UniProtKB/Swiss-Prot annotation:
Name of the protein: Large ribosomal subunit protein bL28
GO terms for biological process, alphabetical: translation
A GO-annotated cellular component: cytosolic large ribosomal subunit
S-S pairs: none
InterPro entries assigned to the protein according to its UniProt record, in alphabetical order: Ribosomal_bL28, Ribosomal_bL28/bL31-like_sf, Ribosomal_bL28_bact-type, Ribosomal_bL28_sf
Residues annotated as signal peptide: none
Record keyword Ribonucleoprotein present: yes
Keywords: Ribonucleoprotein, Ribosomal protein
Highest taxon in the source lineage: Bacteria
Homology family: Belongs to the bacterial ribosomal protein bL28 family.
GO terms assigned for molecular function: structural constituent of ribosome
Source species of the chain: Pectobacterium carotovorum subsp. carotovorum (strain PC1)
Pfam families referenced in this protein's UniProt entry, alphabetically: Ribosomal_L28 (PF00830)
Length: 78
């Protein structure tokens, strides 16, 4: 399972750890992903999405029905 938010598309990005001496070592910044069940009132069922914390806020703002319509338009499975 890839580390990508299904709602926002957030994915890991590369960067550096910096020590006190400013030595740079490569690292990855991972999105804050959670598998979360959302109740879809129109379909009378739960839908499980892998979303970031920001994705959950987007769902709270727009509503799950609108977000699922966007996912369907992109051709993404859920």
């Amino acid at each position: 399972m890839s580390r990508v938010c299904q709602v926002t598309g957030k994915r890991p990005v590369a960067g550096n750890n910096r020590s006190h001496a400013l030595n740079a070592t490569k690292r990855r910044f991972l999105p804050n992903l959670h598998s979360h069940r959302f109740w879809v009132e129109g379909e009378k069922r739960f839908v499980t999405l892998r979303v970031s914390a920001k994705g959950m806020r987007v769902i709270d703002k727009k509503g799950i029905e609108t977000v699922l319509a966007d996912l369907r338009a992109r051709g993404e499975k859920y």
